[in-house]
Amino acid sequence: MCVPICSCENSLISNKFIDLQVNGHGGVDLQSANSIEQVQTVARSLAKHNVAAFLPTIITGSLEQMLKQVTLLNSAAKKQSSDEAKILGIHLEGPFISKTKRGVHPEKWIIDANLEIAKQFVSLGNIRLVTIAPETTGANEVIKFLVKNDVIVSIGHTNCSYEQAMVAFDAGAKSVTHLFNAMPKDLDSGIMRAIQESKQVYVQIIIDSIHCTIEQMKFAIENFADRLIVTNDPITAAGLGDGEFPFGEMKLIVKDEIARRQDGTLAGGVATMESSVKILKSIGANDELIKDLTYSRALELLKTTL
């Protein structure tokens, strides 16, 4: 497809963003936050970087801990003020994911898709998006249940085949979590072929020149521009510089704007949506496309407005 090209380096862009994957911000980790005030710190920190709304994201942990964090986030969502980025719902990134593509998710808490556990999460309310690996046992049943209950299913942290991805999309999965990360990167791989063929599926991507190469970002824009969504996948350290920061049960080391576990595994992002916009402009995206990728498209996926 034809991609709009930015004709003016300093042309105006939308100064409001939506982020569908926020693990933490402003020094607070949402995996271990234990007060509404801490969640508010995240929301205020995001707002300072022009994020209008977001999905607080809980990664794989013990069932008890994940349920506790969902309850806390729901309480915080009911007590928001005008200086906070709005909570649009909760993103569960796990625990039904692939152990081989787990990234920094703790392996001991990763489980096959489980309908009864999915029901526990949904019963708490406000679950808007769930990342799942379609190759896990029971995934198809859980996907259908989530879709029936108006939860968006996103394929991610997966090593699935083409056939498994297509079965998931046919069951109602309508998104992909952080393209090129925690999945096979080869364009001829099963999941990549399935994504390219499934025009109804939205594609989320981290734009920070760390999680994806310039070539991968250009490929995504050239092939998925009308269904692409930019996320930052920010962690506790976002915007705070180098250092050690908590992330669930582990510590992450940030050096030169790259967050890694102690064993070197790449973790979430530390960039901002403003920096993502600069990268998008540098590779030729125009203002209209940038607004779509960083704001409008996310609302379209969520079927909501601000």
Where on the chain are the PLM-derived regions?
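Conserved, mostly hydrophobic/aromatic
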Residues: 21, 46, 92, 146, ...
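Divalent metal-binding pocket/active-site signature
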Residues: 92, 99-190
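Active-site-adjacent C-terminal substructures of enzyme catalytic domains
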Residues: 142, 164-289, 302-305
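Non-catalytic positions within long, well-ordered alpha-helices that form the structural scaffold/packing
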Residues: 47, 74, 122-123, 147, ...
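Divalent metal-dependent hydrolysis catalytic cores, especially in the metallo-beta-lactamase
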Residues: 22-29, 40-69, 85-98, 125-135, ...
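Residue-level marker for buried hydrophobic side chains located in beta-strands
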Residues: 16-18, 154, 230-231
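Generic structural signal for well-ordered alpha-helices
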Residues: 42-43, 67-74, 118, 143, ...
